Amino acid sequence: MSQSLIVALDFPGKQEVEQFLHHFEGEELFVKVGMELFYKEGPAIITYLKEKGHKIFLDLKLHDIPNTVKSAMRSLASLDVDMVNVHAAGGSSMMKAAIEGLEEGKQEGKERPICIAVTQLTSTSEAMMKKEIGIEKTLEEAVAHYAKLTKDSGLDGVVCSTLEVPKLREVCGNEFVTVTPGIRLASDDVNDQVRVATPKRARELGSSYIVVGRSITKAENPLEAYKTVKQQWEGVTV
């Protein structure tokens, strides 16, 4: 599982990112850049992280009409990011357009970024989904439906809860990528996410990638916390 641990850089700006990455001199990480950081710093933060040798999951969760998403993905691919995402709720035409944009915008001689779709946010409970979003399926059924739609639209995988991974393996096969946020060490507060799991549990359930934020970024010693998460995730001593 080389570089399948993604560290969420949930910081307000570049200064905080630099302070955090100071703990990881010489380490090549797979990092997630979300809306807050990207909207503050723009493409320059991607250039900075790439120059440091890090892989990047640009987590913007695009959801718009197909042509707009295609154009946006063309631009994002030109930044040489490694992974991007959309909302599966945008539909098949939008997701197919996303792939077209990535293919058109990728740097010469390189593969297009991995493209995944969000099924349901990890902050979404089944009760919330039914009452507020108006989906009458069970949470598992809704996620499986979106995952199959994602695969049929030509995307590489989905963002999902670890608890949903086994079902998605049945529906979409073992090659389908599952990226699972909501990962916490057993001693951590779960904060605002409802469907959470430990790194060990994510490994047991078959996640392809895990995304870890506060357990590492808020730790007194981020490097040691990273090693602890990595050990639990990979099942080996590092």
From Swiss-Prot:
Quaternary structure note: Homodimer.
Keyword Lyase: yes
Descriptive protein name: Orotidine 5'-phosphate decarboxylase
Residues that, per the record, bind substrate: 10, 32, 59-68, 122, 184, 193, 213-214
Residue positions of the active site: K61 (proton donor)
Function: Catalyzes the decarboxylation of orotidine 5'-monophosphate (OMP) to uridine 5'-monophosphate (UMP).
Biological-process GO terms, alphabetical: 'de novo' pyrimidine nucleobase biosynthetic process; 'de novo' UMP biosynthetic process
Family: Belongs to the OMP decarboxylase family. Type 1 subfamily.
SMART domains in the cross-refs: OMPdecase
Example of a GO MF term: orotidine-5'-phosphate decarboxylase activity
Origin organism lineage: Bacteria, Bacillati, Bacillota, Bacilli, Bacillales
